[in-house]
């Protein structure tokens, strides 16, 4: 089982509420245990419930890879300590790093795997370099399909990538070279182009919004290297 449809309290926008890497999944608090178990079974990593300033939209606010997870600088110390404690319990060697910038929706503005990161051109060059240093990867500033919200417009793992359907062939080639995986265009949740908001994915599998169609699932599996 490497792909499953799921909803979070009837919302198909799973990526808004979580961050998935090859080491761990951070997900909003309050989900039913049976849904947490689906995520564990499909993504095959520990699933840790978390909040940021009591907000549930942690996929919008945070992002990361196996090396580090970036969170807004204003996250409460108690929330950071709770995540770090859970990481220690599971033996997860991933840093949690509050990142000081005027932009708080880090999950919307950063797209990353364990090989590279694409950050919105809204970030300064110095900020981009710092993000790359924290994540331990090569970093570039740019857009996808003319959009600054590169983290919402795409999803990328260490095996593949899927981005907004209006991305050009030139962008796909550039993204493939950057992330060192094949990158395709596609949608989820019955035509939603902001695929990063619709799913949680890592190299082991993907959970997608429950509105995702059969043809979309086939494309997602292909793009993320799961078939």
UniProtKB/Swiss-Prot annotation:
Superkingdom field: Archaea
Q: Which SUPFAM superfamilies match?
A: Pentein
* Residues annotated as signal peptide: none
Q: Return the CDD domains for the record.
A: IF6
**Pfam families the record matches:** eIF-6
Q: Which UniProt keywords apply?
A: Initiation factor, Protein biosynthesis
HAMAP family on file? eIF_6
The family assignment reads: Belongs to the eIF-6 family.
NCBIfam families linked:
eIF-6, PRK04046.1-5
Write down what this protein is called. Translation initiation factor 6
- Gene that produces this protein: eif6
